[in-house]
């Protein structure tokens, strides 16, 4: 019975490359000359440092641009609040989301069941497994999910025949 998994996961290698490119651009840009603006990464947590709120916005724009160039969807980013750290300096924690959350998984299962396509959807940890008898049914489920779920980037992998 053919099946596939619906997952939501950013390519962390591309995220790391985008951070390195962002830091390189920030270090060479004239408007950041003499400032302590940078982006640091620890696992799935990014920390943006800047001298003030305006420069923090600039750092964020540079990072988003580099992520977009490397085909990493910016909807994976979850921005924390801006914190003041000593003097005028500010930082912001940005987490990279991973996995299909419980609410989103329930929404996906509900959409699949309401579509009346002859497939079964089940939640398995951070993924939703969709299984059916025909490959065409699975392809129509993929098209339907791409159209209906727009708030979170979805990937489809682990295709089995």
UniProtKB/Swiss-Prot annotation:
The keyword Nucleotide-binding applies. Keywords: Nucleotide-binding. GO terms for cellular component: cytosol. InterPro entries: DUF520, UPF0234_N, YajQ-like_sf. It comes from the Bacteria. Belongs to the YajQ family. Nucleotide-binding protein. NCBIfam families: PRK05412.1. HAMAP family: YajQ. This is Nucleotide-binding protein Bcep1808_2648. It comes from Burkholderia vietnamiensis (strain G4 / LMG 22486).
